[in-house]
From Swiss-Prot:
Family membership: Belongs to the universal ribosomal protein uS11 family.
The UniProt record lists the keyword ATP-binding: no
Gene name in the database record: rpsK
Gene3D superfamilies named in the record: Ribosomal protein S11
Subunit structure and binding partners: Part of the 30S ribosomal subunit. Interacts with proteins S7 and S18. Binds to IF-3.
Native organism: Rhodopseudomonas palustris (strain BisB18)
A Pfam entry, by short name: Ribosomal_S11
One Gene Ontology molecular-function label: rRNA binding
GO biological process: translation
Protein name, UniProt field: Small ribosomal subunit protein uS11
Length: 129
């Protein structure tokens, strides 16, 4: 059995002017995905992929670094304007949004799309510290 040739997928440069930034900020991590208007992923990053481990992933600074990384990737595809959809209760929401604006994007709208249960699943027990 011979060695199989490893195929390298080249990322084709799309030329998309506007898109949607999905910022999902949980208690443990912050993920940012930039998609086009149809929802196809163009670039993504998270605090974990930026090298933060453990409790440092949930910090606002980690979210800011992830937002700077994803904005650099999206600007390579020619993106200039963004709609931002923020979800989750985490601490990285505002800092990720500020980092996207500081990267040079024109933010046209900011929506909070956090899901709220109509008394669905039983929540976790209260922490007693």
């Amino acid at each position: 059995m011979g060695k199989e040739a490893t195929r390298v997928r080249r990322r084709e440069r799309k030329n998309i002017a506007s898109g949607i930034a999905h910022v999902n900020s949980s208690f443990n991590n912050t993920t940012i995905t930039i998609t086009d208007a149809q929802g196809n992923t163009i670039a993504w990053s998270s605090a974990g992929t930026m090298g933060f481990k453990g409790s440092r992933k949930s910090t606002p600074y980690a979210a800011q670094v992830a937002a700077e990384d994803v904005s650099k990737k999206a600007q390579e595809h020619g993106m200039r304007t963004l709609e931002v959809e923020v979800a989750g209760p985490g601490s990285g929401r505002e800092s990720a949004l500020r980092a996207l604006q500081a990267a040079g994007f024109t933010v046209t709208s900011i929506r909070d799309v956090t899901t709220i249960p109509h008394n669905g699943c039983r929540p976790r027990k209260r922490r007693r510290v």
